[in-house]
């Protein structure tokens, strides 16, 4: 079979990617950027349109808006909001580091994945 949909069987992986997109402010997640590897791992292929200090989130994984974030991850988000790991901070500008902290804090406070209130943050094709 040349193509088969694996979306339903890999929902947790896609939700993890959605949380990552929100945290990193991914500006261009398309369905083609979600690839199922040979051993069943989901890979997110990105091109560097992430970590911007201005809100630019565009993702095809809005399906999970409103889904709760588990308590363990919320505590990790709070820790990240307080201090970004040095190896990541070294790659980002001060403004980008502050924005990651702000997004981590906002996600922890919200406790769920956000909704696209504009209705315009959908790159194509959808997942």
What name fits each language-model region?
Residues 1-127:
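Phosphate/dinucleotide-binding and metal-coordinating scaffold of catalytic cores
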